[in-house]
UniProtKB/Swiss-Prot annotation:
Homodimer. Heterotetramer of two MnmE and two MnmG subunits. Its main location: cytoplasm. GO terms for cellular component: cytosol. It comes from the Bacteria. It is found in: Cytoplasm. FAD binds at G20, A21, G22, H23, A24, G25. NAD(+) binds at residues 279-293. Signal peptide: none annotated. This is tRNA uridine 5-carboxymethylaminomethyl modification enzyme MnmG. SMART domains: GIDA_assoc_3. NCBIfam families: mnmG_gidA. Keywords: Cytoplasm, FAD, Flavoprotein, NAD, tRNA processing.
Length: 635
């Protein structure tokens, strides 16, 4: 039992208290304080605010979309990575624009310090180095927290962003230690406090790979992976990335690596029974990869530098909790790493989380008013997912403090909406990671138009300034104006046009056809027709891409918007009690099983079942509508 202390020497009443200062906590503390709430951020170590505990990178498939959404809403992650990145890439550019995604390697320590300095500059934000061991609750309402050193701090809004620190346990072979990260203490009291108020807790597991010394690697024999020559920023406020970029490198596991892993599987905590918790399905350990994909002769390994000055390299793709001596052999079995020195071992970590179905879409707990959860405490994995949740929780606190109706992010308007919807209605069975495939309306949720979709919400709360908001509106007014012009411009003979036709090898065209039809050809880019649109020549690459995509995918976008309206109309559609799910062509086996078990009464309820995807709901809708039409015609 922690003895309470009377603390008159520093303020002990706040509008909002944020517990934990990882990516969820940093975003939550920034948004709450920026929005005018007197906020306290409590973390066990002020030197690890914004720390990249695992990979030194931000963004990626779907994750990059969320970073841009967080930025559009006034968050800090996009700005920080633009200022601290060491390699920038736009992923998936060979595919459709809906899945293009920015990713950047970070200068790891610089990123962390930039987050800390950004928070320190907020006038409404105080910071304390301590832990929180107990929630103070009266009549199912949070009234404050009690810290590890016995101080009581009072507030009606608490955001828990505890990461992997709740009753956590680190594993390296048979070695175990109660750490939240390697060599950092766990927090036990808070788990007990949550359980005391009947919040459903579970256990999850994650892991991290070893870090190696750059000077012990023969980089000359490895494949080089460079960044983009013209990198795209994450933040809508960043005009251009001018930082020096450095390469990553690629190697592969091999037969020797796999043999070594198989021979030592009994020493892996995951396979010895030492770890019982569920790990991330989409970020498996190297042990899992070798066992689950036994037919694969090799697995790709990325060597990612952790900064300009440090010699540490992150081995992306080799997450492991094997004993350290085995890790050394494993690493040295890789091409180019025959003499590699491990400076930090890989490890697995088990930790408590709270079932996210305990939450409202605002991320407030259903059982305790004023208590919000964000990040890995909700069963997610990833910096970007955490940042998005921290922002949502802080938005909810601000709306509560200002007596505004809560802001509920829709699946049809943001990846953040998809994330929150999946968590609170479907829950998690393993650490949740965002993918573009989770968003049924991803063509509308492109990374380039996050400002158009969401910036208005940040502006309304004072989190986005007038200049940024006006700049966004001006941008889309320009795009819309030129788009309307494109519909009217006929193709006419000219030397420039003939040169373009010859260059592209185009013969099947007609003079008089409108420019929009010509632009819809896959080989034609907006830059190719700038001689017809001189005003576009001064635009940014992003603005040109937006214009081009809206022309090329006009039909698909229009159909998607119509589908959203149509589906919203039928969310309350009743599912017949005698429905035969097995008879619905295309319905997945898992969906059939879950639907038969839960027996949802409406389409909306069906979509809230874990294992039932949006595509399954679409099939249900078409089936029910088809059946009704047949019955109507028969009668």
């Amino acid at each position: 039992m922690i003895e309470s202390k009377n603390q008159s020497f520093f303020p002990n009443r706040f509008d909002c208290v944020v517990v934990g200062a990882g990516h969820a906590g940093s975003e939550a503390a920034y948004i709450a304080s920026k929005g005018g709430a007197k906020t306290l951020l409590i973390t066990m170590n002020l030197d690890t605010i914004g720390q990249m505990s695992c990979n030194p990178a931000i963004g990626g498939i779907a994750k990059g979309h969320m970073v841009r959404e967080v930025d559009a809403l006034g968050g800090i992650m996009g700005k920080v990575i633009d200022n601290t990145g060491i390699q920038f890439k736009m992923l998936n550019t060979s595919k459709g624009p809906s899945v293009w995604a920015p990713r950047a390697q970070a200068e790891k320590k610089e990123y962390q310090l930039k987050v800390k300095h950004t928070l320190e500059a907020e006038k409404n934000l105080s910071m304390r180095q301590d832990t929180v061991e107990e929630l103070l609750i009266e009549n199912d309402q949070v009234i404050g927290v009690k810290t590890g050193r016995g101080f009581e701090i009072y507030t009606n809004h608490v955001i828990l962003t505890t990461g992997t620190f709740l009753s956590s346990l680190v594993h390296i072979g048979t070695y175990q230690n109660e750490n939240g990260r390697m060599c950092e203490p766990t927090v036990k009291g808070l788990s007990k406090s949550l359980a005391k108020y009947n919040l459903k807790l579970g256990r999850l597991k994650t892991g991290t790979p070893p870090r190696i010394h750059k000077n012990s690697v023969d980089l000359s024999v490895l494949a080089i992976q460079d960044g983009d020559a013209n990198p795209s920023p994450f933040s809508f406020s960043t005009e251009k990335i001018t930082r020096r970029q450095i390469p990553c490198y690629i190697t592969y596991t091999n037969v020797e690596t796999h043999k070594l892993i198989h021979e030592n599987l009994s020493l892996s905590p995951m396979y010895s029974g030492q770890i019982q918790s569920t790990g991330p399905r989409y970020c498996p350990s190297i042990e899992d990869k070798v066992v689950r994909f036994a037919d694969r002769e090799r697995h790709q390994v990325f060597l990612e530098p952790e900064g300009y000055e440090t010699t540490e390299i992150y081995l992306n793709g080799v997450s492991t909790s094997l004993p350290e001596e085995v890790q050394w052999k494993l690493v040295r079995s890789l091409k180019g790493l025959e003499n590699a020195e491990i400076v930090r071992p890989g490890y697995a970590i088990e930790y408590d989380y709270v079932d996210p179905t305990e939450l409202k879409p605002t991320l407030e707990t259903k059982k305790i008013k004023g208590l919000y959860h964000a990040g890995q405490i909700n069963g997610t994995t990833g910096y970007e997912e955490a940042a998005a949740q921290g922002l949502v929780a802080a938005y909810s606190v601000l709306h509560s403090l200002k007596n505004l109706d809560p802001l509920l992010f829709k699946r049809s308007e943001s990846y953040i909406g998809v994330l929150i919807d999946d968590l609170v209605y479907k829950g998690v069975e393993d650490p949740y990671r965002m993918f573009t495939s989770r968003a049924e309306h991803r063509l509308l949720l492109r990374q380039d138009n996050a400002d158009q979709r969401l910036m208005k919400y940040g502006y309304e709360l004072g989190l986005v300034d007038q200049e940024s908001y006006d700049r966004m509106k001006d941008k889309y007014e320009r795009v819309n104006s030129v788009r309307e012009k494109i519909y009217q411009i006929p193709l006419k003979p000219s030397d420039e046009f003939q040169n373009l036709l010859d260059q592209k090898g185009i013969t099947n065209y007609k003079f008089g056809m409108k420019l929009d039809s010509f632009l819809k050809r896959p080989e034609i880019k907006i830059e190719d027709v700038e001689f017809m649109l001189p005003e576009v020549s001064s635009w940014s690459e992003s603005e040109k891409n937006i214009l081009e995509m809206e022309i090329k995918y006009e039909g698909y976008i229009k159909r998607e918007l119509e589908t959203i309206q149509w589906k919203n109309k039928y969310l309350d559609l009743a599912i017949p009690e005698d429905i035969n799910y097995e008879s619905i062509a295309g319905l997945k086996k898992e969906a059939i099983q879950k639907l038969k078990t839960h027996k949802p009464m409406t389409l909306e309820k069906a979509g809230q079942i874990s294992g039932v995807d949006p595509s399954d709901v679409d099939l249900l809708l078409y089936h029910i509508k088809g059946k009704r039409k047949q019955e109507a015609e028969a009668s």
